[in-house]
Amino acid sequence: MNLIAHRGNITGRIEEDENRPQYIDDAISMGYDVEIDIRKVGDDLFLGHDTPQYKVDYNWLIDRKDKLWIHCKNVEAMEWFDSNREFNYFWHEKDTVTLTSNGSIWAFPGKQPIKNSIAILPEIFNDNISQCSGICSDYIQQYKTK
């Protein structure tokens, strides 16, 4: 099962650390994949959920590509990743599901059970995760032993 730290969170939401590069690296070093929010502004890529906060570059992304689930936050980011297909990326807003570039089913919170999907924040809706292939959570550590 894929265990994905939502914006780098492991044991609960720490909003001021979300999407911070070192926070992401900490989650990866603990063995988790990480969902990150990224946008393109001009020629630059930035991590950050609501605003561009942390500038990153191609090399930063490529060094972590096997552990990242990249949520494109604007069309420009989606176009950039579409030209750099080696990454696992997706776009969604309030869709029930979306397909990531690697073919995974990314399911909106509260929409489970969906066979072979990634459950997003299942703890919020007490989702049935028995058919999921992965979980993305702010509390991902609690799923490690389940």
Regions inferred by a protein language model and the residue ranges of each:
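Phosphate-group recognition and catalysis centered on beta-loop-alpha active-site segments
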Residues: M1-K146
